Amino acid sequence: TFVLGRKINPKVSSIGAIDGLQAEKSFGNFYTGIIAGFRPDISDYNFNPDLMQYGAYVGLKSQTKGFYSHTTLGAMEQNNSGNVDRRYTYFQHSSTIAQKLNIFSSFELDLYNQVTADSVGKPRLTNLYILVGYRINRMVDFSLSYNSRKQIVYYETLKTDIERMLDDDIARQGIRATVNIRPANYIGIGGSYSKRFQSNDLNKSDNLNGYLSFSKIPWIDGRFYANYNRNISNYMQTNIYSVRYSRPIIKMKLDGDIYYRL
């Protein structure tokens, strides 16, 4: 399989968009691929010929009755005007069990440290994400996720900020739990709780969110959505209420929308 142009590869989605060539070959349940091209500009997401990147990956896929999974391991080097900007390895896994349990996980290990002149320095975990979702039945599903992120250091692109970024090399962590309930056709109820934290107690926050939706209102038609959000951080506390009603005025041509936020 060959792809030319800008595309996000679902097997290595943590890399983001790739401008260039992607090629992949399968050998039974195993697959291998190469990437050669450029990454979008960090400031405006446009094509930038100075930001060359290349890498390769291997993976294993499995599909049986009641089980489906993809697991990928790869390495990538990103340059800026011919100089090493970032060098790292990445891992990604996704699986579905019995059409009810979904698991997704990924991590990135940075290997290059220009400051210490190590072409392969001490591995630095810059990104870890784990998501588990479970569908109890057609009416109820919930999910739980954890993420830990450090600032990604591009040694050439962000050279004026390297010392500050490495001095602030603290993982921002977060957990999130969500639940969605569909008690009847056209009715949805749900909520989520998320918490952000880091080891020095800065940038902490707690967020609670809940919603009620009617996708088809009897007699008057249209859609109704009500939402409540409460956020508490080191600096402020907010409570936001919002409601929205929308419906078609001229079918397939004109919609009307009323929104109120408090």
For each predicted feature, which ranges?
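Gram-negative and organellar
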Residues: 1-262
